[in-house]
Swiss-Prot record:
GO biological process: regulation of DNA-templated transcription
Sorted UniProt keywords: Cytoplasm, DNA-binding, Transcription, Transcription regulation
Localization in the cell: Cytoplasm
Family listed: Belongs to the TACO1 family.
Highest taxon listed in the record's lineage: Bacteria
Descriptive protein name: Probable transcriptional regulatory protein Francci3_1368
Natural source organism: Frankia casuarinae (strain DSM 45818 / CECT 9043 / HFP020203 / CcI3)
Length: 251
């Protein structure tokens, strides 16, 4: 998962100071609203909502905004939107497989915007099922590497909660579990005093494509263009990008 994980942790670091933080806030608020609409407005009885709120708070989304989103989703406040969850599949430069997750109130707009962003950046939209089989739906918790913390320490804290593996991804430890165990793993890590920096349902690649600097730069440009769309919540891809190549791309 090296390339994808490095990119994920890089995005996480940048998110707090990103000039487009308002767009990030909007995506997080949308996730909270949909979670409340789907499973009710009480996070104690709705783990998906609890995780969405925790993620929003970790990115400094104001509490008032979060509370209003919960109330809109649960029907306590007017103005809630009926969002549709849609996943698009694509191939990018270098044969990289891409999954695009959207939450949209306009399927036609989302499809058009995603297609344009992909094709303008050297990719092609693929038929349903032609890409998704290369990924597994998992829970992924990122834990900050504090002084003295080891992979074994992390594994010991989260194993009984359903963790399958712990990976060292640079400045964080990545805990992988079944998607249904995400909430339990996050809670176990937090209860053990570990610094959880994110907890998400993710599509992790079962097969990766190794990229050199030029195709890597093209793929990351495509990913950023797609992520910038209002209807897009997440983008997953199976590029394996080494540290050296990431440094070249970022220079």
């Amino acid at each position: 998962m090296s390339g994808h994980s490095k990119w994920a942790t890089t995005k996480h670091k940048k998110a707090v100071i990103d000039a487009r933080r308002g767009k990030l806030f909007a995506k997080l608020i949308k996730t909270v609203e949909v979670a409340a609409k789907t499973g009710g407005g009480d996070p104690a009885g709705n783990p998906t909502l609890a995780d969405a709120i925790a993620k929003a708070k970790s990115q400094s989304v104001p509490n008032d905004n979060i509370e209003r989103a919960v109330k809109r989703g649960s029907g306590e406040l007017a103005g809630g939107v009926n969002y549709e969850d849609i996943t698009y599949e694509a191939y990018g430069p270098g044969g990289v497989a891409i999954l695009v997750e959207c939450l949209t109130d306009n399927r036609n707009r989302a499809a058009s915007d995603v297609r344009v962003a992909i094709t303008r950046n050297g990719g092609t939209v693929a038929d349903p099922g032609s890409v998704s089989y290369l990924f597994n739906r998992k829970g992924v918790v990122l834990i900050e590497k504090t002084a003295g913390l080891t992979e074994d320490d992390v594994l010991l804290a989260v194993l009984d909660a359903g963790a399958e593996e712990v990976n060292d991804v640079g400045e964080a430890f990545e805990v992988v579990s079944e998607a249904t165990d995400l909430h339990a793993v996050r809670v176990a890590a937090t209860d053990a005093g570990l610094a959880v920096t994110s907890a998400d349902i993710s599509w992790l690649p079962s097969v990766s494509v190794s990229l050199e600097a030029e195709p890597a730069a093209k793929v990351l440009k495509l990913i950023e263009a797609v992520e910038d769309l209002d209807d897009v919540q997440n983008v997953w891809f199976n590029a394996d990008i080494s540290d050296d190549v990431m440094e070249l791309v970022g220079s």
